UniProtKB/Swiss-Prot annotation:
InterPro entries in UniProt: GlgX_C, GlgX_Isoamylase_N_E_set, Glyco_hydro_13_cat_dom, Glyco_hydro_13_N, Glyco_hydro_b, Glycogen_debranch_bac, Glycogen_debranch_GlgX, Glycoside_hydrolase_SF
General function of this protein: Removes maltotriose and maltotetraose chains that are attached by 1,6-alpha-linkage to the limit dextrin main chain, generating a debranched limit dextrin.
Keyword annotations of the record: Carbohydrate metabolism, Glycogen metabolism, Glycosidase, Hydrolase
Annotated SUPFAM superfamilies: (Trans)glycosidases, E set domains
Site (Transition state stabilizer): 443
MF GO annotations: glycogen debranching enzyme activity; hydrolase activity, hydrolyzing O-glycosyl compounds
Protein name: Glycogen debranching enzyme
Pathway assigned in UniProt: Glycan degradation; glycogen degradation
Residues annotated as transmembrane: none
Xref: CDD domains: AmyAc_Glg_debranch (cd11326), E_set_GDE_Isoamylase_N (cd02856)
Disulfide links within the chain: none
The keyword Ligase is annotated on this UniProt entry: no
Length: 657
């Protein structure tokens, strides 16, 4: 039997050098680490890793080749009260594995035990890691590096975006390949999108609870192997990496960036009753935030929280991010529950992972977007991230919905959100683009559902409608559900137009949820994380071409307005913005706080957004000059000069002079 050589302690993971494979694994508390390799017949061969450099265990297997399947058995104490849960009866996934073979099924053998260890061997059913060799021709690929001020983000799910697209070949729908298909790229280009933000593509598992109900984790926020692509989105699992890179290369050629939603806050091992896949059995005490009683700090709502202040975990997370940039040429990241990244355990802007990213010549050059909260005390950190980060702006989301759908927001508060929420983000040398403005996202109502439902309808999720937020700031316009009279449909359409216009013509970085531009509905489900079906897949055959054209026209209009593209904070008298009342006069303090919901926003001295958010048709006197309505609010031919706009109830219009 071949013996392992000592090998070397870096880099982490399994790496083929042309003559064999070097294996490395971090564990500060292990007493012994076995490398387990499996031949074509599934026969297991075990090797003790002979090298032990600090907290890194390592060994070199001569003559090993790409395609080799492997895992680890890690020996150490079973001391739950101290946070140690070693169990060598369980085969473990390499945290840095780049491909996984097998499925993460709900099986008692994939659990280590709660108070007492489960010593039943699980190698026969446990997923295995696969050694991967990296040879890929990027040709002349170069990142688009779209300036933040010019960025338009489109948030989409790999499968849901294309699975029902009639113009994409059936055999590649719902896959990485489909993202790079000319039909999809042309659509994004015509819409005006500059960055495609993908929900998680790293290998994830469906929670046992969902599997027992016949459901699955659709969104992917339950990671198990952060370096490996989720194989279900590939035409062939063996070629997933190349399929993904082909798509990125094609998108880059079209000038479209790719941003990955990445989950560094927790793992699919969940709470202490959850499965044992990897980190818990490798070094539970180091990888997770552990309470004094040995249980987990659950600051994520998912059962556990990664300890991103531990030096080894910081190295692991940093290596993971660098891998996606260097190996896959991604252009940035959106970090789920990103407040966890700054916990020490209190949140700090100079937390170790933030500092590592700031000092990394690779990671400091890509787009970084934070979901700036977690569920722990002190977890709401909107506006408090380091300068390199942009942040999801929930202030904007709630303000836009309240203004147009609940009618209870003063003009001053609305204007503050329209101006990139400068009260929140204008600090630490940050620019307006730090505010990622959104009206909807993957979690919550779709845009159409915002105007069709007053209440969530999540019964299909199997939690008796308890899941999902109740604070939707939605308005069904008088009837719960889709459909209705022509008048109802038109009023809902007008509200959608108003929300889209507010999103796409505000200062800051706009993010559009895929499907909102053509009226996608989830039938009132505002937490469709476990709905891998027609509820979430975009139905292109039912798409509203009129709404799509309206959205595209708004995006292209945005690109013509210097005040929105220059990414500079607006200052009084700089010519970027003027705020006027219905008579084209500056608003008084009382009007800002208590006045009627009528406002004119003059941008770059040439573009005028006239707003009447009252219940009555109102005459709006435009500023001096020859004004004409412009697309998408009027045709391009034969512009009509006007000095007064008869503003319909809850309406708006954009003019140019």
């Amino acid at each position: 039997m071949t013996q392992l050589a000592i090998g070397k302690p870096t880099p982490l993971g399994a790496h083929y050098d042309g003559q064999g494979v070097n294996f490395t694994l971090f564990s500060a508390h292990a007493e012994r680490v076995e490398l387990c390799v499996f031949d074509a017949n599934g026969q297991e061969h075990r090797y003790d890793l002979p090298g032990h450099s600090g907290d890194i265990w390592h060994g070199y297997l001569p003559d090993a080749r790409p395609g080799l399947r492997y895992g680890y058995r890690v020996h150490g104490p079973w001391q739950p009260a101290e946070g140690h849960r070693f169990n060598p009866a369980k085969l473990l996934i390499d945290p840095c594995a780049r491909q996984i073979d097998g499925e993460f099924k709900d099986n008692p053998l994939l659990h280590a035990g709660h108070n007492e260890p489960d010593y039943r061997d699980n190698a026969a059913i446990a997923p295995k890691c696969v050694v991967v060799v990296d040879h890929y021709d990027w040709e002349d690929d170069a990142p688009p590096r779209t300036p933040w001020g010019s960025t338009i983000i489109y948030e989409a799910h790999v499968k849901g975006l294309t699975y029902l697209h009639p113009e994409i070949p059936v055999e590649i729908r719902g896959t990485y390949k489909a993202l790079g298909h000319p039909v999809m790229i042309n659509y994004l280009k015509q819409l005006g999108i500059t960055a495609l933000e993908l929900l998680p593509v790293a290998q994830f598992a469906s929670e046992p609870r969902l599997q027992r109900m016949g459901l699955s984790n659709y969104w992917g926020y339950n990671p198990v192997a952060m370096f490996a692509l989720h194989p279900a989105y590939a035409c062939s699992p063996e070629t997933a990496l190349d399929e993904f890179r082909d798509a990125i290369k094609a998108l880059h050629k079209a000038g479209i960036e790719v941003i990955l939603d990445i989950v560094l806050n927790h793992s699919a091992e969940l709470d202490l009753d959850g499965p044992l896949f990897s980190l818990r059995g490798i070094d539970n005490r180091s990888y997770y935030w552990i309470r004094e009683d040995g249980d987990y700090h659950n600051w994520t709502g998912c059962g556990n929280t990664l300890n991103l202040s531990h030096p080894a975990v910081v190295d692991y997370a940093s290596a993971c991010l660098r891998y996606w940039v260097e190996t896959c040429h991604v252009d940035g990241f959106r970090f789920d529950l990103a407040a966890v990244m700054g916990r020490t355990p209190e949140f700090r802007q100079d937390a170790p992972l933030f500092t590592a990213i700031q000092n990394c010549p690779v990671l400091s050059q890509v787009k970084l977007i934070a979901e700036p909260w977690d569920i722990a005390p002190g977890g709401y950190q909107v506006g408090n991230f380091p300068p390199l980060f942009a942040e999801w702006n929930d202030h904007f989301r709630d303000a836009a919905r309240r203004f147009w759908l609940h009618y209870d927001l003063p003009l001053g508060a609305f204007a503050g959100r329209f101006a990139a929420s400068s009260d929140v983000f204008k600090r630490n040398d940050r620019l307006p683009s730090a505010a990622i403005n959104l009206v909807t996202a993957h979690d919550g109502f779709t845009l159409r559902d915002c105007v069709c439902f007053n209440h969530k309808h999540n019964e299909a999720n199997g939690e008796e409608n308890r899941d999902g937020t109740n604070n939707n700031y939605s308005n069904n316009h008088g009837k719960e559900g889709l459909g209705g009279t022509l008048d109802l449909v038109e009023r809902r359409r007008d509200s959608i137009h108003a929300l889209l216009t507010t999103l796409l013509l505000s200062q800051g970085t706009p993010m559009l949820l895929a499907g909102d531009e053509h009226g996608h509905s989830q039938h009132g489900n505002n937490n469709a994380y476990c709905q891998d079906n027609q509820l979430t897949w975009l139905d292109w055959s039912q798409a509203s071409s009129g709404l799509t054209a309206f959205t595209a026209a708004l995006i292209h209009l945005r690109k013509r307005i210097p005040a929105l593209m220059e990414n500079r904070w607006w200052e009084e008298g700089d010519g970027n913005v003027r705020w006027l009342n219905r008579y084209a006069q500056p608003l008084s303090t009382d009007e800002w706080q208590n006045g009627p919901k009528q406002l004119q926003i003059l941008l770059s001295d040439r573009f005028l957004i006239a707003i009447n958010a009252t219940l009555e048709v109102t005459e709006i006197v435009l500023p001096a000059g020859e004004w004409h309505a412009i697309p998408p609010f009027a045709g391009e031919d034969n512009p009509v000069i006007t000095a007064v706009w008869q503003g319909p109830a809850h309406g708006l219009c954009v003019f140019q002079r």
